[in-house]
């Protein structure tokens, strides 16, 4: 079947770049697709073209997607366009699904029993908690365990050497090399493997057993890979092995949208594609069908300053006025109040004109508004306001690890000790993190006296005669601060702990950041007492745990990561301030290491991905502090003033 006949039989509105991509079937092909360029349409249409125009049996094609949801979506779209019978003959899998098949086939061919897959999250968490406690000599919080899991995934997906793993101890705030080694030893002893091991074992099996590799190469001579920029080093290595016989590899991605470095995403594979696949063709899809021209132009100009990328330019297909604006507020709390007012307007529009428009034709109830932010905790003060005002919102991928982060727990434990001075166990957890200057052996004696005599730890310190005059003075000073905490507003209590009780110094000694403490301060500013803040935190944790998703709500809260691949009519980017987004600046680009440059450019990509979610309007919040990304993106900033009652003026 010729192209013209295929077009007539399966009509699709494709531009010239898309048509070229669809018709590029043989040999290695890298398709670089800018945001909103219709890459899924091209992938699905290309599969149909391979089958109907080129006569390739669908059983010979393997399509690799990043998530199970993407697998299901692509299969459904293919079935809708080309029929379910043909769709059922195609193979759509995640890389883990492919590896599970490889391991199963290995066992069947060799007669050996592969390790069983460990998919019980509780068993994994309990095991890692025991290993962490042994290595760190302290109990792991849920946040600590989440960090351990992320680092283990990173190590296995990045194919790190033992030397490189030990180097991670310097920056990981834990003995990750020890934890990693003990965890893997336990897995082997139990004859188990985790999801990341699936890839490690599958890769090893393909390398060591040529017959197994040939079987898969013959089974799938054509490979299509989606979201290649998010694929890890070991995943790319597996794909390269599978494609090495025919080199019929079609890889779709965009290094400008690679934002999963913490999960070991390996965009370098896209940059070195031509080197690794001689004779490769690199195609571009540069037309953005999603966003207004002003958004496209601003975002493209911004990302052009990255250096670790292919040369390409995003172009708009939509006309539109300049709709990229800065909202400059004095404080982060002003930002939250502004967004609460926006949410209230969305709710009113939805309630009054469901499916309709306002009198002036501008307020469509189906209009989607998304607030995008870097981390989940950035949204907590906004969620708090929305809940207080009973304003509806929809949240993507709620995350509650904030409440179990070690710095948050430290502050809460200090508050707890202020309220319960007889709590010797809590005293032992915090005494060395505030300016008591008590030695460990003395702290243990004080705790014992407190428990046996049923008195406060501060009275126990007085009765214990082993403290120097200087230390005793420090203890009395700490006791005074503890008493003051009971009389202060929530935010004042947080500031006292951080700046006057020595906790900031402890953070600096440990190389820890105080960013989460700032969120506590903002939440505390809405409470008349420290006890009120503690109660509100419990309520918020319960809300986030139990909240059901209202899919009809058009006001959405999401991290930028969770918004990837999605689009919204209006987007508000929160906290675009140096130190938050970007988390770190590249102070001296000429002297920056390769790793520093890579990390900074990923920060830029994260901002770029957030900006390109917007279809019609993009607003960027700044809070009076340096905001380099916003300055780069915008040429005509608009300042918003927040009224006394918290209702913003129109930007």
Residue map of PLM features:
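P-loop NTPase Walker
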Residues: 1-113, 214, 297-300, 612
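Conserved helicase NTPase motor core
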Residues: 3-7, 12-23, 27-38, 43, ...
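Short glycine-/polar-rich loops that comprise or flank the Walker A/P-loop
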Residues: 27, 56-60, 87-88, 245-248, ...
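Helicase P-loop NTPase motor core
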Residues: 35-43, 278-281, 286-392, 419-420
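ATP-hydrolysis module of ASCE/P-loop NTPase motor domains
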Residues: 87-89, 108-197, 288, 440-441
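Conserved helicase core region in the C-terminal RecA-like lobe
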Residues: 93-101, 224-227, 252, 375, ...
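ATPase/helicase motor core of nucleic-acid motors
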Residues: 320-321, 351, 363-490, 504-508
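Accessory C-terminal helicase-associated subdomains
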Residues: 360-363, 463-570, 583, 615-619, ...
